[in-house]
Amino acid sequence: MEIEPPQAVEVVDPEVRSYVYSLVTALGGTAGNETGRYVLGDDALGCLRDLKKWLRFYDEKLNRMDVARCLAECKLLNGDLVPIISLYGDAEQSDKHKARIMLACLELLVPLTWPVEVHGQMTFNHHRHTPYLQYSQVEYKRGILGFAPSPILRALIRVGLPSMAIPRSERSTRDEGIIRLMLYFFRNIAVISSPPNLPIDSDDDKATRSATINAFQQQDVFALLLTMCSNMGNDFTFQDVIILEILFNLVKGVDVDQLFKLNERAGTIKTDDLQDILQKEDELNREHSKNAPTRHGRFGTMIWVKRDDEKLSTVSGQDVLKGDRATFLKMDKTKKWNKPKFKREVVDPSSNNFNLKVRLTSSATKHLRTFVEEFLDSGFNPLFTHLRKAIEREADRVTESTSRQFWYAVSWFLHAERARREHQKETRQRSKGTSREIEPDSFSLVASVLNQETFVGLNRFMQHSIDFKDWQDLTAGMKCLTQILLTVQEMAISPLEEDQEIAENIQSRIFYEETTHDRVLSILRNYKDQGFWYLDACTELAHVFLRMLEQYSKQNVDMQVRSRRRARRKQAQAAVPNQNETEAGGEHDSDTEDIAEAHQTVTERSFDFKRFSVRFCTQKSVDTFVALTKYYRELDSEQLKRAHRFFYRVAFKQDMSVLLFRVDIISLLFKMIKGPEGLDPSKPPFKDWEELIRQIFKKLVRKLGERPELVVELLFSKINATVFYLEYGHEKQTMSESRPATELELKPGSASTLDEKIRIVVSALIQEDKKPLVKWLSQVLGSAASERLSWEMEAEARATSSPQEQSDRSKAPSIAVLPEDDGCRTAMFRNARLRLLMRLAGLERLDEDVLGASWMIPSSVPSSNLKEYHELIEKHCESPAEDIDGVDPRDLMRRKRTAADTDSSRHEFTENVNFGSDSEGEDDGVLFPPNLPERSKALKTLKQRRRRRRRSDDAEESGPDEAVLEARRTAREKNALERQRKIKSDLYVHASDDESDEEADIEFFAKEEMRRQAQARRVAEALETGMPENNTTKKKSKASAGRKRKVKPVLELDDDDSEASPPKRRRSDEVIESDSDGELMVGIGSTSPRRSQTPPTSADNIFGSEKSPSPMFPWSVGVDQMMAKLQGKDEASADNGESNEDEGEDVLSGTGRTRRRRTMGGFVIGSDSDS
C-alpha cells in the first residue's frame, strides 16, 4: 500500500492571497531601474488605499489575520513602504501628491506594526498566524530602525508637523487623526520586542530597547515628545494616553540606579556584575561536580534506606553513599507534590510586564538619562496632571491598562528624581571647592503627583485591584506608594524649609487614614502564589511604610488616625433614624451609649505605634517574608536586609519569636548559614544573618528547656489566641472595668439661666423615658430642702440663746443621696444626662467615680437653693419641652472636654518615650518659685538682717572655723532647695483659682475703683499746675537720698545695662498703673538707655523691643500683693501730695530696677506714642 504524500495546508484563502499580491506588485519596485532606486507604479496611491481597505474590512471586520499574513509574506513594509518613505521624506509640504502618499504609507504602517496580543478569546486562525506575525514585526522594526539611506522616523515626524503647527482650536478631525497616527506608530515601535519563545536569526541589536532609544534620540522623537508633554493641556489634549504608553514601554524594566551612576563608576559596576556572574557560575559548577557522574559510575547505584518506622526506601545515585545527610537530602529532592492546577485566564506574559529587567548599552543609557532629566524638568507635571484628570473622569481614550501604566510611570520617574538628586549630590561633593555652590532644587518638579487628589486616586486604584484580584495592577500601585513614601522621606531632610513643610503635610495626610494602614496589612497577610514580583513589591511596601510610620509617630507624639468605625455608626443611625437606645439593646442607658461610643472612637483614633506594629507580627505576615527569604540565593542586599529587619522586629522588638519556631522556618534559617547551597559568606548581609539566626536558635533552645511541650508546636503555625501563652508560658492578664458615663455640658449659647439649663436636661431625660429618675431626684431635693431648712431654723434659734455654741456648729451637715434601687444606682453611674442634672442641682460626688459611688448635698448649699432646684425640676417634669427653638433638647448637649482627658490620651502616647529622669533631681530644677514676701515680712527681714550684722561684728573673733561654716552653708542650701521643690506657689495657684473666688473678685474691683479715683486726682492736679508730677518726685527723691538707706535690688542688670550708667547711682523702681485696663506697665517709654530685666507682662510684649528674661527665673510678682502695695502708696500720695518713690525703695526690694518713665500731663508716654 502506497503512502500518499501529505497535502499542503493553505493557511490563507488563495483568492485573498491573489488579490493582495496583485496590489503589492502594482505598487512599484526596483526592477525597472538600473540604479536600484525604488519607482512607484502608475496608481501607487490607489494601491496603498486599497491595501488599507483590505486590512480594515477583511481582517478587522471578520476578526482574521489573513491579509496581514499575506503582506508579511510578500515583505510589503521593508520592501515597499520604507523605500517610498525614504524617497519622499524630504519632499516639500506644498507637493500635495507626495504628502498624500506619505500619509497613506503611515496609515499602513500603523496596523502592520500594531502589537499582536495574546488573550483568552483567540480563534484557531489567531493561533495559526500570531507567531509568524510576531516574528515579522521584529523584522519590521529592524528594517525601520536600521534603514541606512535616510531616517524613517524623522520623515514620519515631518508628516505630522503641519497638523501640530495649527492651533488646537483650529484643528480639524483629520489633523488630530494625523497626530494620533504618528504617535501610535512610535508607540508600536517602542512596544515591539523579540518574543522569548521565538528564535532570532540575526545577532545584531537593531530591534532591542537600546536600538529604539538611540533611534529616538538621533531622529528627534525625544524632542517631539518633550514638546508635546510640556504643552499638554494647552496645545495638546487627546495625546496624553498615547505618550504615556510610549514612555511606559521605554522605561519599564530599566534599572534607575544604574541609569544615574557616575561615568567613572559605570565601568566598575559592569566589572563587578561580570565578576558576580562568573562567581555564580563557579558555584554552580562546584555543586554540580560533587554529584556529577564519573566513568566508573556508569552502571548506577541503588541502596535501601531504612526509615524510623522500619520501612524501606530505595535511593539511586553514587552521591547517596557519602552519608546519611546526603541520602536524606536526595530523598527530599525526589519528592514531588502534584499541586492542583486551576484554570486561569490566558494572559500574554510580555504584555505590560514591567518586572523583567532590561540592560541598556552605554550610549542608550546616556541618551535615556538625558531625556529623563529634561522630561522631569519640563514635562512631568503637565503630562501627569492631565493624565490623572482623564483617568478620574474615565475619558473614552483611557483603556484598561492606562491606570496600570500611569502608576508604574509615576513610581519610575519618582525613583529617577531621587536617583538624579543623589547623582547631583555626589557630583557636588566630588567637585567641592572647584566651582561655586549650587542651591538645591525644590521637589516642585514632581509636585503634581504629591497632592491629595493623587493619594485618593491611588487608594481607589489599589482597593479596586484588591477587590477584583488584579495582581499586576496592584503591583504597580504598591510600587507607586512605596516611591511616594521614599520621596517624601527625602523631602523631609531637604535643606529647603518649604519642602520640609510639604513633607510633613503629606505624611500627616497619608498616615491619617486608617484604611491605608489596614490595606497595607491585608496586602502583606494575604499573599498567596501571586508571583515573585508581587511578593517583592508587597514586602518592600510593608518595610518602608512601617519604618516611616515609626519615625513619624516618634516625631508626632499626639498622632491621630481616622477610623472607619465612626462612619459605620453614622450609617447605622441613618438607616434607623427613629430608633432610640432602649430598642438598640445596648449596655448603656439612652443616649449615654452614643456618647460613650463617641468617646471610645476618639480614643481609638489616637495612634499607638507599638500596638499597631503588633498587627504586623502575625503568622501570615511571617509566612510572606519567609516566602521571600526562600529566594535568598537570587535576592540582592537590599532585599535580604528587608527580610532581616522584619525577622529581627518579630523576634526581639516585639518579643514574638515563637512565630518563627516552626520546622520549615527553622530548617530554612539553618540552611541559609550552614548549607548546603547557603548564603555566600563573602556577601555583606551574611554576617548580619548569621548573628540573627544564632540568637533565634539560642532563644529556641532556651524556651525548649523551659517548656518541652513547645516541641509539639514546632509542627504547626501559631494562632493569635495562643501566641502569648506559647511565648511567655501564661495567659495574658486582661482586666475589664466599667467606665462611667462621659461628662456632658450644655452647648454655648443654648441656655443662660438655671431655669433654661434644667429645662433642657429634664426634657431630654423625659424624651428617653427616664421620668422616674427625674421624679426620684426631685424627691431627694425636696426632702433635703426640708431637712436643711429645719437645721437653719434650729441654728438661728441656737444663735439667739447661746452664741458660743453656734460658733462651734457653724456648718450644716452634708446630706447623703441614696438611690432607691439598683437601677437608679446604675443610672447614677452610666446616665450622662442624669449626672449633668445632679451637678446642676448642686450634688457632688464623694468617692472615686465607680459604680456605687456616694453622692451628697454639700453643706454650702442653703435650703432656699435646694427648694428652687426642686421647684424647677418639678415644673419642667410636669410640662417638658419637645423641642427648644426647633431643636431637639438632646442635641443641645455635648461631651465635656477636660484636662484629665487630654492628659490621659497624651500619656498613652508618651508612656514609652524617654523624656529624661522622672525624679525631681538636680537636673529638673525648682518647679515653682517661692511666694514673694509681704510688706510687713520684708520690713521684718530687713530688721533681722541688721541685728545679725551687729551680732556678727561683736562675735567675729569667737566664731566657728571655716569647715563648720561650709558644712552648715551646704546643709542650708540643700534644705532650701528641697523646700522650694515642694512649693506650690501661691502666685500660680491663684492664677486659676481666683477666677471662681467671688470674695477676691469683690476685693479686686474695690481696689481697682480706688486706684482709678487716685489716678484721676493726680491727673487733675497735674493739669491744674501744668507741671509733670515726676518733677516733684525727682526732687524729693534727691533730697531724701541721704536720709533713706537704700536696699540693693535682688536682681542685677545685664552687662550692657550696667555699663550704661555708674553703679553708684541706683534708682528705685517706679511702678505706674494703666488707667485703661489695670495692667502692670514696666519699663515703657523711657528715654534712658538702661533697661532692667522686667517681668514679661502683656504691655512689655507689645511695646518692649528688648529680649525677654530667661525662663529659668520666672517672675512671680503677685497681683494681689502688688495692687495692695500700690493702693497704699496711692492713698498716701492723694492725702499728703507726696511722691511714693521713697517708700518703694524699701518695699519693692524683690523686683528689678526699671528705667524712669517719661510723663506728659500725668500720662505715661509709651514707645508707640513717640510717633
Swiss-Prot record:
This is Topoisomerase 1-associated factor 1. Residues 887-910, 965-993 have a biased composition (Basic and acidic residues). Residues 938-950, 1033-1048 have a biased composition (Basic residues). Transmembrane segments: none annotated. It is found in: Nucleus. Pfam families: TIMELESS (PF04821). It comes from Coccidioides immitis (strain RS) (Valley fever fungus). Keywords: Cell cycle, DNA damage, DNA repair, DNA replication inhibitor, Meiosis, Nucleus. Residues 1085-1100 have a biased composition (Polar residues). Forms a fork protection complex (FPC) with CSM3 and which is required for chromosome segregation during meiosis and DNA damage repair. FPC coordinates leading and lagging strand synthesis and moves with the replication fork. FPC stabilizes replication forks in a configuration that is recognized by replication checkpoint sensors.
